[in-house]
A protein has these predicted regions:
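RNA-contacting regions in translation and RNA-metabolism proteins
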Residues: 1-46, 56-82
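Glycine-centered tight-turn and secondary-structure capping sites
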Residues: 48-52
């Protein structure tokens, strides 16, 4: 488990009314760490935020946490279950 994954999981859980419906999956693709954030359909808007500002902030924090570990991190936010 990476620091970037931990950051995304904690923050996304705090943003939703149902943190137990948040799932984070981490995988490696072509030298990049891909973090997929799955949230329940009704909670996606809270994680994305107005004009995507919350999503952009989550991506920036995940990238910064990954950079500390020498990794390139990409965050994708998805509706539903993994």
């Amino acid at each position: 488990m990476s620091a970037a994954r931990d950051v995304v999981e904690v923050l996304a859980g705090a943003l939703t009314d149902a943190p137990d419906l948040v799932r984070v999956v981490e995988s490696q693709h072509q030298g990049t760490t891909l973090i997929e954030l799955f949230v329940a359909s009704g909670h996606a808007g809270r994680v994305i935020g107005k004009q995507g500002r919350t999503a952009a902030a989550l991506r920036a924090l995940a990238a910064a946490a990954g950079e500390k570990e020498g990794k390139t991190v990409t965050l994708e936010i998805r509706d539903g279950r993994p």
